[in-house]
Amino acid sequence: MVLLLPSYIFACDFCNCYVGLNPHYKKNSIGFRYHYMAYSGTEMSAAELKELGLNKKDFFENEMEYELHAQYYPVQKLQIMASLPYIYNRDGMSNKAKAALGITHHDMHQEDMKAENVYEGIGDMTLIGVYQVFNKISMDSAGFSHRLLAGPGIKIPTGKLSVNEMSEAHLFTHQPGMGSWNPMAAMTYIARYQKAGARLNAVYLAGTENKFEFAPGNKVNVNFTGYYEMKWSKWQLYPSVGVYWESAAKDIYYSEKVANSGGSMTYLHIGSDLYYQKFALEAAFQLPVQKQLNGYQAENNFRLITGLSYTFN
């Protein structure tokens, strides 16, 4: 499976979801977010699968994240964001694949009777601090406004990592934690004209080696989203559509590049944020429209994100 940047970093766009278009900008907040990602495929070629009478749909991976996130303004132009997920990853295969491969070491899930493995636990914490480089606000509410924020971050190894020196490289990508400190850099630019606007985000993560000599590949995410503001009394709705692009270099294990790792994917994003006084509800659906993966990997079928947050001074 291609290990791209953690989705919980980007679902919030490292600025309390859609920073710059939400009415809670420059206010402290805390919230919960749920992510669901569905994959299909395995580290076998199409020819190998065909020989066994199988296809990639006989193999699945489901990733779920339950994320607690917060943002805090210690001073006017500095925003600190923190994110801590609980991760539940499940991979498995159909009975047909289990019989064809002679798998006996997988557990049997009694609900769907598919061989599976489960990896769960607290994930790695992410801390990011962004500084407001500029904020040009039009005196006319119907005019043009824009701003730029940028700053560093760090991914802290708080997550569970259940591997050993003999583990296969692909097992690291399923773990809740990576076991290494990974520096980051983040940038966001927001522009608005009347009730319409756009946002451009970019985040870079540098992979570092853990004690098992595994290092995730360096990763970058760039996304562009357009939105429109709609108001009814105390309610505010921001529907949005955009494109998310993610790219990752190959992982490194014992100083060797991992063949079935890294690559790039592009997602179509459709979402909406609903605000009522101090509360915000978000939902988004992301569908892959382009992929270029190295080797043989499970492919993402879709991503679903929902969340609820509360704002306070």
Regions found by a protein language model. Name each.
Residues 29-33, 79-81, 128, 149-151, ...:
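Residue-level detector of the transmembrane beta-barrel scaffold of outer-membrane proteins
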Residues 34-40, 84-90, 133, 154-160, ...:
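Transmembrane beta-strands of outer-membrane beta-barrel pores
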Residues 28-30, 64-68, 123-129, 148, ...:
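Hydrophobic, lipid-facing positions within transmembrane beta-strands of outer-membrane proteins
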Residues 89-203, 208-215, 313:
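Outer-membrane pore/translocation modules
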Residues 37-65, 166, 173:
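Surface-exposed strand-loop-strand hairpins of Gram-negative outer-membrane beta-barrel proteins
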Residues 58-63, 116-123, 142, 177-181, ...:
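Short sequence motifs at beta-strands and strand-loop junctions characteristic
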Residues 43-45, 52, 211-313:
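Outer membrane beta-barrel transmembrane domains
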